[in-house]
Amino acid sequence: MSTNLRKTHPLAKIINSSFIDLPSPSNISAWWNFGSLLGACLILQTITGIFLAMHYSPDISLAFSSVAHITRDVQYGWLIRNMHANGASLFFMCIYLHIGRGIYYGSYLYKETWNTGTTLLLLMMATAFVGYVLPWGQMSFWGATVITNLLSAVPYIGNTLVQWIWGGFSVDNATLTRFFTFHFLLPFTIMGLTMVHLLFLHETGSNNPTGLNSNTDKIPFHPYFSYKDLLGLILMLAFLLTLTLFSPNLLGDPDNFTPANPLSTPPHIKPEWYFLFAYXILRSIPNKLGGVLALMLSILVLFMMPILHTSKQRTAQFRPLTQILFWLLIANLLVLTWIGGQPVENPFITIGQMASILHFSILLILMPIAGAIENKMLT
């Protein structure tokens, strides 16, 4: 009897134990599809990004026109560029749904997997930010100026830090060059950390909607979940292509069709939609340092999720109070996203402040209390 090469070859057996014979819970729903979709997004973004880098010039006198050249003169350049830009939006849609699933079903109790995942989110945000600067349009330039300027709020070393990042006394050629370097480098760091994320996940196996131990009922990943993931992938690509081919500039900013001009500030400086919730939290605090800390904490609060879990049950599936708070959190994040795109005037300022307070209250205070109350209700 010959042994199966898939199970003996040093490389093949790693792939086999990760994607073929991997024991998976039989009851994981479509909410567990987003991990593979994020992997697909990463591959797509890397491929389109490399092709764009072949034609892009990271110099302030050439950047804007090189992007115009890509969309006009390069074979399918318009498609590659629009897929890359909208692929970033899709990437964030998937990661936000993936994190939402993690919070709802208590996946954060796999601490190592959760912490590597949160670090991946931070790296992704950094990559998207430096990437947005590269076309060197008005919003690219002013977005870079405003966000890097936030570091000047750091006590004592703030101004030095900002000038160090800029490579001069303003956002200039040196800034664009280093941002291009980071935008090229970070995705490969993300790939490496993704492998660590998977390694930690496969130490414990997947969680499932009930939150109960699923060791008694496991099925092989292939063919069951490989085909389920394939369906998700087809739907995601259909959505991406529809967005790219019918409305490629829907999520972009019209100001970015104007070349960067340090002498003219756009009336409303705002980031891409996927950063608006954090931007609204930043703006809702009148103090600069306070705003920067709140901005950081709005993401870093995810690292605290495992510590703040008080319930005897893992998932929110059978916890009505936590369910109410979870959906309130989602609604509140949508409100913050809307506020982030509005001008700084009443009533938007007040709404933003209320929503910011609620964001932290739900995660840090109300959810742990709800967990404790639900424990009492069980006894």
UniProtKB/Swiss-Prot annotation:
Its cofactor is heme b. A ubiquinone binds at residue 202. One of its GO terms (molecular function) is metal ion binding. Heme b b562 binds at residues 84, 183. InterPro entries: Cyt_b/b6_C, Cyt_b/b6_C_sf, Cyt_b/b6_N, Cytb/b6-like_sf, Cytochrome_b, Cytochrome_b_C_euk/bac, Cytochrome_b_N_euk/bac, Di-haem_cyt_TM. The chain crosses the membrane at residues 34-54, 78-99, 114-134, 179-199, 227-247, 289-309, 321-341, 348-368. Heme b b566 binds at residues 98, 197. Component of the ubiquinol-cytochrome c reductase complex (complex III or cytochrome b-c1 complex) that is part of the mitochondrial respiratory chain. The b-c1 complex mediates electron transfer from ubiquinol to cytochrome c. Contributes to the generation of a proton gradient across the mitochondrial membrane that is then used for ATP synthesis. Heme 1 (or BL or b562) is low-potential and absorbs at about 562 nm, and heme 2 (or BH or b566) is high-potential and absorbs at about 566 nm. This is Cytochrome b. The lineage of its organism: Eukaryota, Metazoa, Chordata, Craniata, Vertebrata.
